[in-house]
């Protein structure tokens, strides 16, 4: 009987059929609990080679559309059948397996630079090779690897990566001065306004007054500190060019701050700019516009 049993077993084992049946039986018994997930092969163009013996569902609620949504639009990855390679279209349900930086970032040392900063999954220099990746809890799950293996960071930067332009509150200020002082405040070729902007960082512009044609508006834009410093420089400039009197007064005050001299120096010298035709102060000028305006010095 034993010999006969061996003879009956030979034909099945000669071509490996006996081993195949044993493996299929074992695999089927261990995979019975997997009948809760759809078979990706069945719902693909290639079809499922296992037929009724497949360990995954061939009848899934929602059909192809539901399975396609799960596999292509970020749903949970479907486990492959035991002993087979995982499907290529399975989407990772979290960060990539590598948690350290193993490659150099090819954007770091370029002119445009790397826009991901500390959140980049590549090393910014050899010193970062092997450094753990910075995983932001607010970062959404990546939508699949790029051809280079670089998983996409979140599309929007975090508040900590906001642009420097948003730092510091922006404000505006307006100073009204006599229109005759505008030229002196601007300076030849805009030298004065450029200097104020360069030193304080505030933007400065001189525009017409809304209602009074005898006045000009000096408009300042920047942070509160920038406007404060620029306003102080503008007022010092107005005093230095002899515009210390308020805009309402049409006659200049006797006291002149030019050169720190006493008020008796008013109109005691000829205006050099007037002879060149470039005086911008007009009647407000503290120097004489011609011999007929010359006054004798009080010291004399």
Swiss-Prot record:
GO terms for cellular component: cytoplasm
Protein name per UniProt: Zinc finger CCCH domain-containing protein 14
Native species: Oryza sativa subsp. japonica
InterPro entries: KH_dom, KH_dom_type_1, KH_dom_type_1_sf, ZFP36-like, Znf_CCCH, Znf_CCCH_sf
MF (Gene Ontology): DNA binding; mRNA binding; zinc ion binding
Region of interest (Disordered), ranges: 1-38, 243-262
Coiled coil spans: none
Listed Gene3D superfamilies: K Homology domain, type 1 (3.30.1370.10), Zinc finger, CCCH-type (4.10.1000.10)
């Amino acid at each position: 009987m034993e010999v006969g049993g061996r003879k009956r077993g030979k034909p099945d084992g000669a071509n490996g059929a006996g081993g195949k049946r044993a493996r299929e039986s074992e695999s089927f018994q261990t995979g019975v609990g997997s009948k809760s997930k759809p078979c990706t092969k069945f719902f693909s163009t290639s079809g499922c080679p296992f037929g009724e013996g497949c360990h995954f569902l061939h009848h899934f609620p929602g059909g192809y559309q539901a399975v396609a949504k799960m596999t292509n639009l970020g749903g949970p990855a479907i486990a492959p059948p035991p002993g087979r390679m995982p499907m290529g279209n399975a989407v990772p349900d979290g960060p990539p397996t590598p948690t350290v930086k193993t490659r150099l970032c090819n954007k770091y040392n370029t002119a445009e630079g790397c826009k991901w900063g500390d959140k980049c999954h590549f090393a910014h220099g050899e010193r970062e090779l092997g450094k753990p990746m910075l995983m932001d809890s607010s970062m959404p799950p990546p939508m699949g690897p790029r051809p280079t293996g670089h998983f996409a960071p979140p599309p929007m930067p975090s508040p900590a990566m906001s642009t420097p332009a948003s730092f510091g509150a922006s404000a505006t200020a307006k100073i009204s001065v006599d229109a005759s002082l505008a030229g002196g405040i601007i300076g030849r070729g805009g030298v004065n306004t450029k200097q104020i902007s360069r030193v304080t960082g505030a933007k400065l512009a001189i525009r017409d007054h809304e209602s009074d044609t005898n006045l000009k508006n000096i408009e300042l834009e920047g942070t509160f500190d920038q406007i404060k410093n620029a306003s102080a420089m503008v007022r010092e400039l107005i005093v230095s060019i002899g515009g210390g009197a308020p805009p309402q007064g049409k006659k200049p005050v006797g006291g002149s701050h030019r050169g720190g001299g006493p008020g008796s120096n008013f109109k005691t010298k000829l205006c050099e700019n007037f002879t060149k035709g470039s005086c911008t102060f007009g009647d407000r000028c503290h120097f004489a516009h011609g011999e007929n305006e010359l006054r004798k010095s009080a010291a004399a």
